[in-house]
From Swiss-Prot:
This is Glutamyl-tRNA(Gln) amidotransferase subunit B, mitochondrial. The keyword Ligase applies. Pfam families: GatB_N (PF02934), GatB_Yqey (PF02637). One of its GO terms (molecular function) is glutaminyl-tRNA synthase (glutamine-hydrolyzing) activity. It catalyses: L-glutamyl-tRNA(Gln) + L-glutamine + ATP + H2O = L-glutaminyl-tRNA(Gln) + L-glutamate + ADP + phosphate + H(+). Residues 1-41 form a transit peptide. PROSITE patterns: GATB (PS01234). It comes from the Eukaryota.
Length: 621
C-alpha cells in the first residue's frame, strides 16, 4: 500500500477533508492510465496470455448457465403460483433478515460521503475507492466517529415498521475475516439494538398467498444499525476486484420473527417493507437496484410436530421473485432429504437467478464464532423522546393510507393504486401531472369532479407510459427513465387537450411519442399542435351518416344479427358487431378517422341500423 502523505493525513485529522484519490489510489501522474479497483485477490497464479480474456459479468454468467440447464433438462409442466404455496403433510417456517442502505449523506462512523449522496454521480456511476476515509480502510490509528445524522432515517424506518424505539442503544463488534471487511470485524448492534417489537400487516393486495386469508401480521423482532461491506466484483481466473466505496455505508438490519408460512407471503413482506422504507425516505433504493438485500431462514417440519426443524439461511436474494423461488426450492430440498431418511444441517446456502435448487456455500457459523463484544471506541446512543415524536409527526402517509386515498378520493382501482405505489417514482409523477392538469382546467377541475381527471392521469401514467417503456425500439436505459423523458407539464398539456376534445386519442398518443423521443421541446406541445394542424375539427352529422351508409353496404349478414335481437330471437345485443362496423367507419373516414369522434360514430351507426336498415330488412321479409 502506498504511504499516505502527511499533508493529506493532517487535512483529514484537522478538518475532516479527504482527497478524491483516496488512500489506496495515489497516482504518480494525471496522465497515468485508468486503474481498475485496486485491491486484487487471486487464489491461483495468473496465466500469461497475449490477449486479455473478455470479462463477462457474473450476473450474466449465472443467467446463461441457468438457461443452458433449463434447455438441457426435460420440459416440465409449469405450476400455478397457488400450487407451490403448501406441501401436504409438511409445515414451512420462514424468518427474514433485510439489510437496507439508509439514505444519509455520510457513512456511519466516518465523514466520508456515501456514493448515493454524491452530487457528481447523478447517473449512479462512481469511481471505485473514492468515497473512503482512513477508518473505512482500517488504517492504524483511525478511530470511529458516530455520525448523528444517520439516526434520522433509521428512526423513520423503525416508526414505519411500528417498532418501539429504545432510549439507549449500543454498538458491538462482530468478528470475522473476509476481504470485504478490512478491519476484521463489523460494527453492529447485536446486544442492544435501537428498536424492537414491531409489526407489518399484509393484505391480499400486497400479494400474500390465498391460504393466508384476509391479512397476515408479521412480527419484527428488532432493528439494528450496522456497517455495510465492500463491494466484490468477480472476474475470470478466480480474481476479485474490491470497491471500498460501500464500506461503512449505514445499514439498518430488519429481523423478523419466524412467523411466515407461505413463500408468496414472504415475498409480499419484503415488497411491503420496501414500500414502507421508501415512503418515509429511509432507504436509498429498492431491492432490485441493490439498496436492499434479503436473507431468508427456511425450516420445515411434519404437520403436527411441535418443535421447528433445523433452519438453513439463503443469502443475498436480489428480487421479490428470487425470495419466493428460493424458499420454494429450499423447502422442497429439505422435504426430499427428510423423506429419504436424511437430516438437515444448519448451513448457509446460495441461490442463482433461474436456478431450480439452492447450493451449499458454507457451514452455519454460531454466535460464538463471531466473538461479539461491546465496541470500546464507541459510547452509547441516546435517543430523546422529543426527536422520536417530531419524526413521527412529520413522517407523512404510509402505503396503506396512501392506497386508501388513491382509491377513495381519486377513484382509482386497487390494482392501479398498487401499481403507482410499487413503480419507482411513478406515484410522485402522477401527483405532479394531476396537479398541473387541474391547474390548466381551473374551475372546471372542481365542477367536473376530481376523480375523472385523476383516473385519466393515472391511466396515462401507468398504461400509456408503460407502452413507451415496452416498445422494442426503446433501449433499457430509456425504459427505466421514461418519466424523466416525458415532463409532467407536457403530459398534462396532452391530457388537457384530450379532455377538452381538442385533439383525438390517436393524436394525443402520437404527441406523447414525440415528447418521449425528444422531437418536441419541453413546453412545446401546443406549438406542435398548431404547426402540424392537429386540432380536432369534427365532421358534420350528414358526413357521419354518409360514411355509415358506405360501411353498411354489403354487410347484410351482419345486419341479420341486429334483426334477430330486435325480433327477440337473440337475447344478447350484438355489441361486438356494432364495434366492428364502427371500426370500419373510423378507418373509412377522412385521414384514418381524423375529425371523427368514436362515440359520435357509434351513435350514428346505431341510429342508421335501427331506423333505416332494419326496417328495410323487415319489409323484405
Amino acid at each position: 500500500m502506498a504511504r499516505l502523505p502527511t499533508t493529506e493525513l493532517r487535512k483529514y485529522l484537522l478538518t475532516g477533508q479527504f482527497t478524491r484519490r483516496g488512500c489506496l489510489h495515489l497516482r504518480p501522474s494525471p496522465l497515468a492510465p485508468p486503474i481498475p479497483p485496486l485491491r486484487t485477490l487471486s487464489t491461483t497464479p495468473p496465466t500469461p496470455s497475449d490477449q486479455q480474456p473478455q470479462i463477462i459479468p457474473l450476473r450474466k454468467q449465472l443467467k446463461d448457465q441457468a438457461k443452458a440447464a433449463k434447455l438441457s433438462g426435460s420440459p416440465k409442466k409449469k405450476l400455478k403460483k397457488s400450487d407451490n404455496q403448501t406441501v401436504p403433510g409438511w409445515d414451512l417456517t420462514v424468518g427474514i433478515e433485510i439489510h437496507a442502505q439508509l439514505n444519509t449523506p455520510s457513512k456511519l462512523f466516518s465523514p466520508a460521503s456515501t456514493p448515493s449522496s454524491s452530487s457528481d454521480d447523478a447517473v449512479h456511476h462512481h469511481h471505485p475507492n473514492t468515497h473512503v476515509a482512513p477508518f473505512d480502510l482500517a488504517i492504524p490509528g483511525s478511530q470511529p466517529s458516530f455520525q448523528p445524522t444517520t439516526l434520522i432515517p433509521a428512526i423513520r424506518a423503525a416508526l414505519a415498521l411500528n417498532c418501539h424505539i429504545e432510549p439507549i442503544s449500543r454498538f458491538d463488534r462482530k468478528h470475522y475475516f473476509h476481504w470485504d471487511q478490512p478491519s476484521g470485524y463489523q460494527i453492529t448492534q447485536y446486544y442492544h439494538p435501537f428498536a424492537r417489537s414491531g409489526s407489518v400487516t399484509l393484505y391480499p393486495r400486497d400479494g400474500i398467498a390465498a391460504e393466508d386469508g384476509e391479512q397476515v401480521t408479521v412480527g419484527i423482532k428488532q432493528l439494528q444499525m450496522e456497517q455495510d461491506t465492500a463491494k466484490t466484483l468477480a472476474q475470470p481466473n478466480s480474481t476479485h476486484y474490491l470497491d471500498f466505496n460501500r464500506v461503512g455505508v449505514p445499514l439498518v438490519e430488519i429481523i423478523t420473527e419466524p412467523c411466515i408460512h407461505r413463500p408468496a407471503t414472504a415475498a409480499a413482506f419484503v415488497r411491503k417493507v420496501q414500500m414502507l422504507l421508501k415512503s418515509v425516505d429511509a432507504c436509498t433504493s429498492g431491492l432490485e437496484q441493490g439498496g436492499l438485500r434479503a436473507d431468508v431462514n427456511v425450516s420445515v417440519k411434519r404437520t403436527g410436530e411441535e418443535e421447528l426443524g433445523t433452519r438453513t439461511e439463503i443469502k443475498n436474494l436480489s428480487s421479490f421473485k428470487a425470495v419466493e423461488d428460493a424458499i420454494i426450492a429450499e423447502r422442497d430440498r429439505q422435504i426430499r432429504v427428510l423423506e429419504e431418511g436424511g437430516r438437515i444441517e444448519g448451513e448457509t446456502r446460495g441461490w442463482s437467478l433461474g436456478s431450480m435448487e439452492t447450493r451449499r456455500l458454507r457451514g452455519k457459523e454460531g454466535e460464538v464464532d463471531y466473538r461479539y463484544m461491546p465496541d470500546p471506541d464507541l459510547g452509547p446512543v441516546v435517543i430523546g423522546g422529543d426527536l422520536v415524536e417530531r419524526l413521527g409527526e412529520t413522517m407523512g402517509m404510509l402505503p396503506d393510507e396512501e392506497v386508501g386515498v388513491l382509491m377513495g378520493r381519486f377513484g382509482l382501482s386497487e390494482r392501479d393504486a398498487m401499481a403507482l405505489m410499487l413503480m419507482e417514482g411513478r406515484l410522485e409523477y402522477f401527483y405532479g401531472v394531476l396537479e398541473e392538469l387541474e391547474r390548466m382546467l381551473g374551475v372546471e377541475a372542481v365542477e367536473g369532479g376530481e376523480q375523472r381527471h385523476a383516473m385519466l392521469a393515472a391511466n396515462w401514467c401507468l398504461h400509456e407510459l408503460g407502452k413507451l417503456a415496452e416498445a422494442e425500439e426503446v433501449g433499457e436505459a430509456a425504459a427505466e427513465e421514461v418519466t424523466s423523458q416525458v415532463p409532467e407539464q407536457d403530459l398534462a398539456a396532452i391530457l388537457f387537450y384530450l379532455h377538452q376534445k381538442k385533439v383525438t386519442a390517436k393524436v394525443a398518443k402520437d404527441l406523447l411519442w414525440d415528447v418521449f423521443r425528444g422531437t418536441i421541446a419541453t413546453g412545446g406541445v401546443t406549438e406542435q399542435i398548431d404547426s402540424q394542424d392537429l386540432w380536432y375539427k369534427e365532421i358534420t352529422e350528414a358526413d357521419y351518416a354518409a360514411i355509415a351508409d358506405e360501411v353498411i353496404e354489403g354487410q347484410e349478414k351482419v345486419l341479420q344479427d341486429f334483426l334477430k335481437f330486435k325480433q327477440g330471437k337473440s337475447k344478447a345485443y350484438p355489441q361486438g358487431k356494432l364495434g366492428f362496423l364502427v371500426g370500419k367507419m373510423m378507418r373509412a373516414g377522412p385521414e384514418q378517422g381524423k375529425g371523427m369522434d368514436p362515440a359520435s360514430a357509434e351513435r350514428v351507426m346505431r341510429v342508421r341500423i335501427e331506423q333505416v336498415y332494419l326496417p328495410r330488412l323487415e319489409d323484405a321479409q
